[in-house]
Amino acid sequence: GVAGVDLIPAVSAHEADRWMARATATLASLRPGGYDYAYPTKILASLAQGTPVIYAGPGQAAHDVVEAGLGVACSLDVDEIAEAMVAFASGSAPWVGAEAVRAWVRKHRSVEASSCSAAMVVRSAL
C-alpha cells in the first residue's frame, strides 16, 4: 500500500460515513464514455460529511466540484489523481470548507432541491 492511504473493503453505509467524516478527502470516479450523465452519489456522501472530494471523471459532477470549490476534479488518470491527493495532503487544494459544502449540497443536490427542480419542469409543461 501507500503510506497515508487507506483502502478498505466494502462496509455498511454507517461505517462508510464514519470513514468519510475522518478523511482528508475522498475519491470518486466515473469511467468516461459510459455514464457521462451520471452523478456519483459518493460525491454527495462525502460532502454531507463535510469532507472534500477528488472526482476523477466527466460530466456535471466535475463542473460542480470545480465551480463550487468542493474539491478537485481531474480526468481518470493516475498521475492527476495522485497530484490531487498530494494537494489535499499538503493543504494546497481548493476547498470552501465543511459548512459551505453542506450548504451547497442542500441548495443544489438535496432531495428538496431535486424535487423543486422536477416540479418546475412539470409546471412548465402545463
Name what the model sees in each region.
Residues 67-79, 86-93:
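Conserved acidic donor-binding segment of nucleotide-sugar-dependent glycosyltransferases
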Residues 1-17:
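Nucleotide-activated donor-binding/catalytic signature segment of Leloir-type glycosyltransferases, i.e.
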Residues 30, 92-93, 125-126:
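A general structural signal marking secondary-structure boundaries and capping sites
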Residues 24, 50-51:
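A short alpha->beta transition loop at the rim of the catalytic pocket in nucleotide-sugar-dependent
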Residues 2-4, 50, 70:
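A generic structural signal for alpha->beta connector loops
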Residues 12-19, 26-44, 54-63:
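Nucleotide-sugar-dependent
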